Amino acid sequence: RKHGAMNLYTGYRLHNYHFVIYGAMFLGQIEPALRAVKGAWETCPEEMLRIESPPMADYFESYVSFEPHVLVRFGKWNEAIAFPLPEDQKLYATLTAHVHYARGVGHAALGQVDDALREEENYLAAMERVPKARVVHNNTVVDLLAVGAEMLRGEILYRQGKYDEAFAALRRSVALDDGP
């Protein structure tokens, strides 16, 4: 607290919030997950993400991008669809992609396939704009978004009644997540 958020310890705090988010999601507890999302935002001010040398957004922006995933995990489809895009989509490139992913899954789950397809296009376009150097732990965000692309594709295909193609896409998602 003495030196605020503008130090290396912000990374440790974000890492801890990330563990709380995913632990709560695994345990089926939305409230702790959302509190941890809020904590991540509070511990990582935008001014820190705007530091260019070293490029702090590449290290930390992904950690404030998980709320859309929490909404998907708990089937909060309408909230996911209504989730606002960040004003600065270049700075918050990971969050922007996650919002489109969550909206796409939400629309698919509600049977709104045309809207889901539009969000899939938006997701793929947002994915292309994520800097290659952006990371979450030891993973590049681009690699993780590729997992989401196949997952979203599978969700949409399933809602279109193309079950074999849907399950093939979902298997590709799992294979990408498992890694080489």
Language model feature labels by segment:
Residues 2-7, 41-57, 83-94, 124-142, ...:
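Solenoid-like repeat scaffolds
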Residues 19, 66, 98, 102, ...:
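"A position-specific structural signal for the A-helix of alpha-solenoid helical repeats
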Residues 36, 83, 119-122, 169:
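Alpha-helical solenoid repeat scaffolds, predominantly canonical TPR units
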Residues 148, 163-180:
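Generic long, charged, amphipathic alpha-helical segments
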